[in-house]
Swiss-Prot record:
Gene Ontology biological-process entries: 7-methylguanosine mRNA capping; cap snatching; DNA-templated transcription; symbiont-mediated suppression of host gene expression; symbiont-mediated suppression of host mRNA transcription via inhibition of RNA polymerase II activity; viral RNA genome replication
Designated name of the protein: Polymerase basic protein 2
Organism from which the protein derives: Influenza A virus (strain A/Equine/London/1416/1973 H7N7)
Location of the motif Nuclear localization signal: 736-739
Pfam families associated with the record: Flu_PB2_1st, Flu_PB2_2nd, Flu_PB2_3rd, Flu_PB2_4th, Flu_PB2_5th, Flu_PB2_6th, Flu_PB2_7th
């Protein structure tokens, strides 16, 4: 009763009655929604009714001096009434037209620079080609894709520092620009945007687009690089697709593509070396992709690919927690298991020791061309729902799932022995043995698996052992679906560990990745990849090995020279000479090495027979384990260009040609660099050229600072002392001579003193 009385009182007030009868929306929550806060709740509607008004725009009072009250047609451009609640003027949309036609003009030079990403997009679309539209069922799966073509790969924090430095250089706040890319971009943008009149906030927004990778989790069928994603709405619908070729490439896609190729090459090469992990790190640190250090790209680039993730794990970076098997990315979506070693017998009665996963688990499997949902129990496949582009892709997914299930009928389907090896000639682990076996031929596996009658379920059909579709029967537990399975959406990264054989494990010890998972697909990189590591010289064939070996000796001649006289064994064991050995005929390797080492020893013993060009030429041959024999050679053979070519022990040849006049070396006609000293002047021992004018005082003395390289010695003043690095990491203390007259005697004492200082 009380409430009704209260309501009557309220209704007697005319304002209450008006609100409740004339407001169509009388639900308090809705009124609240549309009236609270500054955020516009229905921008489209607001725009429509605003534009229906005569003066929908407000402007600063100064506009009255800058724009006439009426235009040429006599239409009013602004009203004398003030905007309610502010001291601004109400303005007609016609004023904007007048301003665009008659207002002041400013320089447009900065627009293409600030709105670079938009201008480039227009160019790509202008030069792109749109093909025919096809109507067909689209198997789209959600993938994490890059939606922002043409960006650098800075982290949000790095980009923020760059933007603050470029747009608001005088703002307070510590900004630390550390990475190479940050410094380069900042310098470039500051120059480009000098005297820029565009609103700083706008410039900041546009810079963010250029610097940071933006990703979204979108349904995609087809290309996933950013130049395809920017036209996703034009190229694929629910039941149609339109062919499209982009009218240009962008650096970020090229970086992703080239990074994958470099990582695959490096992992493949590291696998066959004595210490795969150390080799992999050495190669990652000495490789450049498109002029940027590979390690910098790895730190910033979120690409998830097996080889890339192995490189990241080696560098101690976090990677995705999903694991890889048979080229598919597996993500456990529910269940759990414990692992137990079990011995099983193949159809050929070979014993395999496999790690069995005990327990019920569900996984999503995502590959490039097929996806699946897998439910399994201990050594039993319960259900596999697979979808793919074609029969072949679906078959690949089924094989991987069947092997992963570890079912007995799969193991019994093995015919013949399992003895697959990796690139380093090591036996693969049992699961990969099985996988390789059935990837070669899966007929027996499919025949032995068993089939079952199926119910008619919308969007699902059966698949027979010969991989043909059926609506009545299907391989036991296997169904083909029209719908794809989404990629795992989380961007969560976990801490992992890596062993020296490049097996990557999570903190529970599960293997996430191993070199067996790295694709053998070869591609051509879009950006130039420079592998400075000697391990990658052979990637471009024997000629490249030859040229690179000699270039390396010349580049490091100052140090090589000292080692040659002080510690030849250490020099011969350098890994830079490893690739060269594959060019020397196996039968003569040891003999050549023994011959060259003896020759070098004679040069060391007899002053005055030191010949730089000859040492450089023969040095790589001395790296093989030597055979003691009295054999003498006038020429040494190397296998390049498909046949044996000769290097003359004394004198020039097409393989190795040293021009005394120009002091330049050509190897197989390619320039291999210049010798910095004349080969004839090294008569008085090797160090003479290096430490002439310096007195060797003894062992390293930390008081005189960090060790300088030989090239840095020239900066010392007379009488100044410094530690200097010679040979393989040996450091001695030297002093620059006060007088020039005594220089000649230095060369004789240098060798003795270095030996004493080191020993």
């Amino acid at each position: 009763m009380e409430r009704i009385k209260e309501l009557r009182d309220l209704m007697s007030q005319s304002r209450t009655r008006e609100i409740l009868t004339k407001t169509t929306v009388d639900h308090m929550a809705i009124i609240k929604k549309y009236t609270s806060g500054r955020q516009e709740k229905n921008p489209a509607l607001r725009m429509k009714w605003m534009m229906a008004m005569k003066y929908p725009i407000t402007a600063d009072k100064r506009i009255m001096e800058m724009i006439p009250e009426r235009n040429e047609q006599g239409q009013t451009l602004w009203s004398k009434t003030n905007d309610a609640g502010s001291d601004r003027v109400m303005v007609s949309p016609l004023a904007v037209t007048w301003w665009n036609r008659n207002g002041p003009t400013t320089s447009t030079i900065h627009y293409p620079k600030v709105y670079k990403t938009y201008f480039e997009k227009v160019e790509r679309l202008k030069h792109g080609t749109f093909g025919p539209v096809h109507f067909r069922n689209q198997v789209k799966i959600r993938r994490r894709v890059d939606i922002n073509p043409g960006h650098a790969d800075l982290s949000a924090k790095e980009a923020q520092d760059v933007i603050m430095e470029v747009v608001f250089p005088n703002e307070v706040g510590a900004r630390i620009l550390t990475s190479e890319s940050q410094l380069t971009i900042t310098k470039e943008k500051k120059e480009e945007l000098q005297d820029c009149k565009i609103a700083p906030l706008m410039v900041a927004y546009m810079l963010e687009r250029e610097l940071v990778r933006k990703t979204r989790f979108l349904p995609v069928a087809g290309g996933t690089s950013s130049v395809y994603i920017e036209v996703l709405h034009l190229t694929q619908g629910t039941c149609w697709e339109q062919m499209y070729t982009p009218g240009g490439e962008v650096r970020n896609d090229d970086v992703d593509q080239s990074l994958i190729i470099a990582a695959r090459n490096i992992v493949r090469r590291a696998t066959v070396s004595a210490d795969p992990l150390a080799s992999l790190l050495e190669m990652c640190h000495s490789t450049q992709i498109g002029g940027t250090r590979m390690v910098d790209i790895l730190k910033q680039n979120p690409t998830e690919e097996q080889a890339v993730d192995i490189c990241k794990a080696a560098m101690g970076l976090r990677i995705s927690s999903s694991f890889s098997f048979g080229g598919f990315t597996f993500k456990r979506t529910s269940g759990s298991s414990v692992k137990r070693e079990e011995e099983v017998l193949t159809g050929n009665l070979q014993t395999l020791k496999i790690r069995v996963h005990e327990g019920y688990e569900e996984f999503t499997m995502v590959g490039r061309r097929a996806t699946a949902i897998l439910r399994k129990a201990t050594r039993r496949l319960i259900q596999l729902i697979v979808s793919g582009r074609d029969e072949q892709s679906i078959a690949e997914a089924i094989i991987v799932a069947m092997v992963f299930s570890q079912e007995d009928c799969m193991i019994k389907a093995v015919r013949g022995d399992l003895n697959f090896v990796n690139r380093a000639n090591q036996r693969l682990n049992p699961m990969h043995q099985l996988l390789r076996h059935f990837q070669k031929g899966a007929e027996v596996l499919f025949q032995n698996w068993g089939i079952e009658p199926i119910d008619n379920v919308m969007g699902m059909i059966g698949i027979l052992p010969d991989m043909t579709p059926s609506t009545e029967m299907s391989l036991r537990g296997v169904r083909v679906s029209k719908m794809g399975v989404d990629e795992y959406s989380s961007t969560e990264r976990v801490v992992v560990s890596i062993d020296r054989f490049l097996r990557v494990r999570d903190q529970r010890g599960n293997v996430l990745l191993s070199p067996e998972e790295v694709s053998e697909t070869q591609g051509t990189e879009k950006l130039t990849i420079i592998y400075s590591s000697s391990m990658m010289w052979e990637i471009n064939g024997p000629e490249s090995v030859l040229v690179n070996t000699y270039q390396w000796i010349i580049r490091n001649w100052e140090i090589v020279k000292i080692q040659w006289s002080q510690d030849p064994t250490m020099l011969y064991n350098k890994m830079e000479f490893e690739p060269f050995q594959s060019l020397v005929p196996r039968a003569t390797r040891g003999q050549y090495s023994g011959f060259v080492r003896t020759l070098f020893q004679q040069m060391r013993d007899v002053l005055g027979t030191f010949d730089t060009a000859q040492i450089i030429k023969l040095l790589p041959f001395a790296a093989a384990p030597p055979e003691q024999s009295r054999m003498q050679f006038s020429s040494l053979t190397v296998n390049v260009r498909g046949s044996g070519m000769r290097i003359l022990v004394r004198g020039n040849s097409p393989v190795f040609n040293y021009n005394k006049a120009t002091k330049r070396l050509t190897v197989l006609g390619k320039d291999a660099g210049a010798l910095t000293e004349d080969p004839d002047e090294g008569t008085a021992g090797v160090e003479s050229a290096v430490l002439r004018g310096f007195l060797i005082l003894g062992k390293e003395n930390k008081r005189y600072g960090p060790a300088l390289s030989i090239n840095e010695l020239s900066n010392l003043t007379k009488g100044e002392k410094a530690n200097v690095l010679i040979g393989q990491g040996d450091v001695v203390l030297v002093m620059k001579r006060k007088r020039d007259s005594s220089i000649l005697t230095d060369s004789q004492t240098a060798t003795k003193r270095i030996r004493m200082a080191i020993n």
